[in-house]
Amino acid sequence: MSRLLVPLVCAAALAACDSDSDREVALRFAPVVGDQPFACGEDFDGIGSGASTVTPLDFRMYVHEVALLRSSGERVPVAIRDDGQWQSEGLVLLDFEDGSGACMTGSPATNFEVRGNVPDHGDYVGVEFIVGVPHEQNHLDGAIAPAPLNAQGMWWTWQGGYKYVRLDMRPSTQSEFFYHLGATNCDGSVQDGFECAYANLPSVRIDGFDPGRDTIVVDAAKILAGVDVDHVPDGVKDTLPGCMAFPGDPECPAMMAPLGLRFEDNAPAGVQTVFSARARGGE
C-alpha cells in the first residue's frame, strides 16, 4: 500500500469509530406481579400488606423524555418514532392489558416497547425516563386528542388531564381497587389551560441497563406492597378503594412512595422500586 494512502485509511477508520450514525432501538418493558408475569385472567397471591389475592383489571402507563446513558455519564435522548397509535411527539403509551379476562376497560391491542433511534455508540449502560404526560400535553381535550392521548379510560375527567398510570385490581372483598396517578390540585380549563399544585411525574433511572440485552421490568406488586387491598373504605375518612390522589386519601402515601413520590408534596420521597433491569433471557 502506498505510504500516502496509509494515513488516509487510518483517518477513515478513526472517523468510522467516532461516527454518530443512528441505529434503531426498541426498549422492551416486562410487566410483572411479584415473580409472575402480568396477565389478564390470572389470579395473583400474596399481594399487599395483607398478602391478598387479586385479579388484574387494567395496567397502562405513559412515559416520555426517554434517554440512554453512556459510560461517560452522557445522557442521549431517544428520538421516538411517531407511529400513529402508541407513540407521538416523544410520548409513549405502554399498554400491558389485552382486554381478556376481567380486563374489560381496555382492548386486545398491547404495547410493550418504546421504539426510536439513538446514535450508534457501544457504551450504553443505563436508561432514564419520566412516567406520565408532559404538562403541555396533559390538559388537551381527550375527546379529540391524537393517539396515544385518545386511549379509552386514560382521560382523568375530575382533573381535566390524563392518568399517568392506571393499575386496577379486583381483590376478594370488593369489585375494584384503584391506582390512578396524575397531576392533582389542578385549576383551569381545557380552553384556558391548567395550573396544578402537584405534578406527580416520577423520574426513573436504571443503571446497569444494556438496551440490546436487557428488559425494563415493571412490578405492579411493588406499588401495592404497602397497602391492604382487601380494606373496604368506610365512606368517611376513606371514600374510595385504592388511590386516586383525592386530597387526604389515606392509601396514597404508601402507593406513591414506590415511584419515588410524596403524596401532596413535590419533594422526592426516595429511590423508586417499581422499575428494574433484567436480562432478556430471564423473561
For the regions a language model picked out, list residue spans one by one.
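C-terminal motif of bacterial Sec signal peptides marking the signal peptidase cleavage site
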Residues: 13-16
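Bacterial N-terminal signal peptides that target proteins for export
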Residues: 1-6
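A short, solvent-exposed, low-complexity linear motif enriched for acidic/polar residues
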Residues: 19-283
